[in-house]
């Protein structure tokens, strides 16, 4: 059984016992989370979402991704700027798909 959920402005294909990395959501490790924006479950397609369909998971970890370096340089001048960014994420284990 598989489903497509929407979270953090992205659509993610999930299966039971999968680990997914999503944009940070509030909660601590070990806390259950329910995704109710389900677009598809097996052969059922929502318009845009399915009613009475949920995906349940448990938060495994809150963390930050690897640092990316953003470098800005203006041509014909000595202006340079170097920035780093680490995007926060949440790792979730999918426990159950209902629908």
Swiss-Prot record:
GO cellular component: cytoplasm; ribonucleoprotein complex; ribosome
InterPro entries on file: bL21-like, bL21-like_sf, Ribosomal_bL21
GO molecular function: rRNA binding; structural constituent of ribosome
UniProt-listed GO biological process terms: translation
Keyword Transferase in record: no
Swiss-Prot/TrEMBL keywords: Ribonucleoprotein, Ribosomal protein, RNA-binding, rRNA-binding
ATP-binding keyword on record: no
Similarity annotation: Belongs to the bacterial ribosomal protein bL21 family.
Function text: This protein binds to 23S rRNA in the presence of protein L20.
Subunit annotation: Part of the 50S ribosomal subunit. Contacts protein L20.
PANTHER family on file: 50S RIBOSOMAL PROTEIN L21 (PTHR21349), LARGE RIBOSOMAL SUBUNIT PROTEIN BL21M (PTHR21349:SF0)
This protein's name: Large ribosomal subunit protein bL21
Species this protein is from: Mycoplasma mobile (strain ATCC 43663 / 163K / NCTC 11711)
């Amino acid at each position: 059984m598989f489903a497509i959920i929407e979270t953090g402005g992205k659509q993610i294909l999930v299966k039971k016992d999968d680990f997914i990395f999503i944009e940070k959501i509030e909660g601590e490790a070990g806390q259950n989370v329910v995704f109710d924006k389900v677009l598809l479950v097996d052969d059922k397609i929502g318009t845009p979402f399915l009613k009475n369909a949920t995906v349940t998971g448990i938060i495994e970890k809150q963390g930050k991704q690897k640092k990316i370096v953003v470098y800005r340089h203006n041509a014909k001048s000595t202006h340079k700027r170097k920035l780093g960014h680490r995007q926060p994420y949440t790792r979730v284990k999918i426990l159950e798909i209902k629908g």
